[in-house]
Amino acid sequence: MKVWMAILISILCWQSSAWAVCPAWSPARAQEEISRLQQQIKQWDDDYWKEGKSEVEDGVYDQLSARLTQWQRCFGNETRDVMMPPLNGAVMHPVAHTGVRKMADKNALSLWMRERSDLWVQPKVDGVAVTLVYRDGKLNKAISRGNGLKGEDWTQKVRLISAVPQTVSGPLANSTLQGEIFLQREGHIQQQMGGINARAKVAGLMMRQGNSDTLNSLAVFVWAWPDGPHLMTDRLKDLATAGFTLTQTYTRAVKNADEVAHVRNEWWKAKLPFVTDGVVVRAAKEPESRHWLPGQAEWLVAWKYQPVAQVAEVKAIQFAVGKSGKISVVASLAPVMLDDKKVQRVNIGSVRRWQEWDIAPGDQILVSLAGQGIPRIDDVVWRGAERTKPTPPENRFNSLTCYFASDVCQEQFISRLVWLGSKQVLGLDGIGEAGWRALHQTHRFEHIFSWLLLTPEQLQNTPGIAKSKSAQLWHQFNLARQQPFTRWVMAMGIPLTRAALNASDERSWSQLLFSTEQFWQQQPGTGSGRARQVIEWKENAQIKKLGSWLAAQQITGFEP
């Protein structure tokens, strides 16, 4: 009873999450968006199944197909499974291909495993499914998966794949096998290399007219032997003896979802002879083959890997002004998971770069993680029917603007506060962008150092700042007064590296104000252009005003 309640709760949670992400479209807009994507996927299907070519990455195709299904559910016009291939095959399968149900996560897999025994895990090899029919010890027929009941006659093609045994003996002499034709790889690490569009490459080779030597780059992984030996160990042994050795090598007994997760993670990082996109867990006990039907396999499930790249919907385009005045563009996304990281924003770059990408709210973009786990845009994979792009702010900012607060300076002013509080500048622990925004909104700072005047009571009464944190912040602000002169100058945005500033031996504001352009050119890593920037900076009226204010606060190095 508890198991069924858990399953019911899971279904309800899934339905709730599905409803929550339905687009806020009018019926007419929904019809247009669904129709456009449906036509594109149909075109990709035709290219893939009729001509053996693919204009889209496998992962992008899968995710956009899932997105289409989601939209159809949202607006009540579900049709057939868009991933079902055209019904061109005329050859009946001796045993139907059932397909495999996908598990959403480890918890769902655990629920499924709880009521079953004698379970085994195999890699979910990424290729194209095939039926191999042996009669009197010889390969009699090879049939593509097709719609699960009928497929194409691939016999002549498969006979040219040297890795597929053409003759067998013993229990396999008169047998029907189901498996995956895959692209042979040497030391393929899924975590690092991804899917490499393996499925489309295999389909292309099998669909191509004429015979090709490149078929020898293919092999087969047998994952089912309908009506074979009852014991999995016997099945694996007989398959290995017949030449299907990979099945025995990559089939392991498992007792629970933790063990499956361990193997799944191992294969995700290991060097394998094929591309995979997850694992399949199957029960050794299977029904008689005459009961096998497409979409009705209850004895096996798949737990796929999180894609290396995810298709994400752009919810909004936002503009940010950095401390130097440069405008950057950020895309807010419908949340996606990448390597256990929830990604909701991705930096596009400059306004020019955004215009080159041509990204608008409603578009679907491919996102992955670059070095140090930073999200990046790989491609725009689908553009919406209605595209309205926001107007970027005027480029009125530079490295000498927004030291003092104003309505037009809001973003650059906040960026300056975030910068001066960072570890490499004044080291104000415990406060980031959200905290600075809360303080500025409540206390209306005049300039970037106004926080030095905040009292413990003011901090304690700031909405968004926990009372337990306010005392810590006040302590941090007071400690900042003891920071060396060079740190304060860096907080003011002097256009120098810390190394160049330290080498200059400037230890007071008055000394720095009297420095010359020639003096700065003599410092390491400081050319004539940078030296001129320093002079412009120290002669700026806002900078001089800040220097005088810090002197009044008796900050070290600024005293008269």
Curated annotation (Swiss-Prot):
Domain of life according to the entry: Bacteria
Disulphide-bonded residues: none
Principal EC category: ligase
Protein keywords: DNA damage, DNA repair, DNA replication, Ligase, NAD
GO molecular function terms attached to this record: DNA ligase (NAD+) activity
Signal peptide (residue range): none
UniProt GO BP: DNA repair; DNA replication
Family matches, as InterPro entries: DNA_ligase_AS, DNA_ligase_B, DNA_ligase_CS, DNAligase_adenylation, DNAligase_N, NA-bd_OB-fold, NAD_dep_DNA_ligaseB, NAD_DNA_ligase_OB
Entry EC number(s): 6.5.1.2
One Pfam short name: DNA_ligase_OB
PROSITE patterns noted in UniProt: DNA_LIGASE_N1, DNA_LIGASE_N2
Reaction(s) catalysed (UniProt annotation): NAD(+) + (deoxyribonucleotide)n-3'-hydroxyl + 5'-phospho-(deoxyribonucleotide)m = (deoxyribonucleotide)n+m + AMP + beta-nicotinamide D-nucleotide
Active-site residues, as the UniProt record annotates them: 124 (n6-amp-lysine intermediate)
Entries under PANTHER family matching the protein: DNA LIGASE, DNA LIGASE B
Family, as annotated: Belongs to the NAD-dependent DNA ligase family. LigB subfamily.
Function: Catalyzes the formation of phosphodiester linkages between 5'-phosphoryl and 3'-hydroxyl groups in double-stranded DNA using NAD as a coenzyme and as the energy source for the reaction.
Protein name in UniProt: DNA ligase B
